[in-house]
Amino acid sequence: MSSEYKYDEQGIFFPVFLLVGTSCCVLPLTYSTILGPSASKEKKNVRDPFQKYRPKDLKVQRKSIFRLRYIFLILGWLAIGFLSYKIANSRLKLNIWDPYEILGIAKGTSVDDVRRHYKRLSIKFHPDKVRNMVNTTREEVEKHYIEITNAYRALTDDKTRENYALYGTPDVPQHISVGIALPKWISESENSIYILGFYGLVFGIVLPYAVGKWWYGSRTYTRDHVHVDTVDEWFPKMETSLTLDELLSLFASSKELTSLVPNEKNPKEYILKLLFDHLNRKKTNNFNTHQILSQSDVVLNALLSVATAFGFANPVDNVLKLWQHIVQAIPLDAPFPLLQLPHLLMEDVKNLSIRNISSIPQFLSLSEEQTKDYLPNYSKNQLKEMREIANGIPRISVVAAKVLVDDDEYITVGAIANLILDLKCSYGTEVVPEVSTDGTETATKKDEEDAEKYHQSKDVVLGDVETLPYAWAPYFTQHHKTAWWIYVVDPRQNRVIVPPFSITDIPKTLRTFRIPFQVPPVAGTFSFQLHIMSNSYVGEDVISNLTMIVKDTSVLQEQLQEEAVSDLEDNSDIDESANAGKDFSDDENIGSDEEDESEYDPMDTDTSDGE
């Protein structure tokens, strides 16, 4: 069997190759862009209660990567359409092996005629007989003669001829052509300089540049996507206690922000000025402010990671509070939650605070008449808008909290405990009672079933999922994703023992979270604090007290053995008492039977009968 590699001369297979390659890139990117993770069946989109109140001129800073993605998708789909059209309208010329055509005779020719015709062809095309090889080579002549010989054998051999008549494929070595789905002009000598230039461009410039850029990025950027110079600037200034102003100064010194204003002599001071104008809600309409705020989430997330690495609780708290103030544009020295409502001015918020109305639920608990009395300078529509926005602001609620160890009734030294949290989103005036643990909680049947689900799914979350709308942040220059950060603090040492992690998509029903952590290495009673802080809203933080009783394994075993022995003794005493009571009751029954027999006189009946 001979084989031959050749390029796509007809231009049929090369478009197919391009179509497959383009589709492998365009289809997954289209799916991730249009559908994405938000299209999961587990998630439910909720109505955006802030939609009609959001600023119409909200400037959403879109990254260039998304613009390039859409351009790439448009060009990719145009290429897919063009290639599909070209393939659909092309005609493939099939080379079917036909011995009659090779010999140049009509189908159905008799065997004798085939033999006579073959003799004439063999004399004419035998490689040793061909003298004038003009525009041909000896290899081509030999190849042609072999085809003639195979065709002759296919028509003169009875079995082969029968196979060919029945199936159209004689039992002879077939000519197999293995092609390469590339156009023929690639292999032509006059185009070699362009092909070599293309290879040199791809493998000599583009590929080294991409690898170098990736390597440089991995060396100069952290996993939080900030420059290493930013982290080097922050680390020496991390202390046990950092105020909001000090953290704002660290935030402004990041390279991600200072690089946005390269023409400023003192970029940090300039950024601080823009940030203070933003926090005080001064209308500057400065483009640099929009750029700074568009990078704030990335920088603040990195600042939180650095604060967590040091383990101090106070900086972690203040980073999240700074995040809230920047998103809501609230001064650092005036953390009033009611400033998040539209139209409400600072002096009116202070007046409400004097009346002990400082939180969103307290504001919503006011009747319409009280609201009008306390806020007489606002129109009816403005007051209505305030209430609707306040009703749409979510806040996290802890429904239940337990510290448990899998398959163990007690928490022992060195074990891996799990903080089980049942959380939900509350709205309006709904208030969930404060939850705390005293260390005496035990696992219920539901906890055991949930633990089995955790092990099966290898997940830390159970329950419903609900996609929340973007945060109500009219002074922020882009849509902001609502999230809560959960971490556990040891208040005695002011240290973070469970690092913060963010959660989103909290439903109105219930969702259970499982947070594993290491039990202290010594026995005793330990008190912790559970912190749940929002990255979007001021005054919606939750702090719950946790108590954990840790027991020593050896002491616990002795106690359990003593309890087991005590239980056995109690059971034996109960059995002896029961047996003694049974013997006493048997004696009484015997005595009573004897008395009954002595009192019985059969003559009484006889006397009565005689009478």
Curated annotation (Swiss-Prot):
Modified residues (Phosphoserine): S566, S572
GO cellular component, one term: nuclear outer membrane-endoplasmic reticulum membrane network
Cytoplasmic topological domain residue ranges: 32-69, 213-611
Pfam family, one: Sec63
Annotated GO biological process: post-translational protein targeting to endoplasmic reticulum membrane; SRP-dependent cotranslational protein targeting to membrane
Localization (cell): Endoplasmic reticulum membrane; Nucleus membrane; Nucleus inner membrane
Keywords tagged on the record: Chaperone, Endoplasmic reticulum, Membrane, Nucleus, Phosphoprotein, Protein transport, Transmembrane, Transmembrane helix, Transport
UniProt keyword annotation of Membrane present: yes
Residue ranges crossing the lipid bilayer per the database entry: 11-31, 70-90, 192-212
Residue intervals annotated with topology Lumenal: 1-10, 91-191
GO molecular function: Hsp70 protein binding; protein transmembrane transporter activity
Disulfide bonds listed in the record: none
Domain SEC63 intervals: 200-503
Disordered, as annotated region: 563-611
Membrane topology: Multi-pass membrane protein
Protein name: Translocation protein sec63
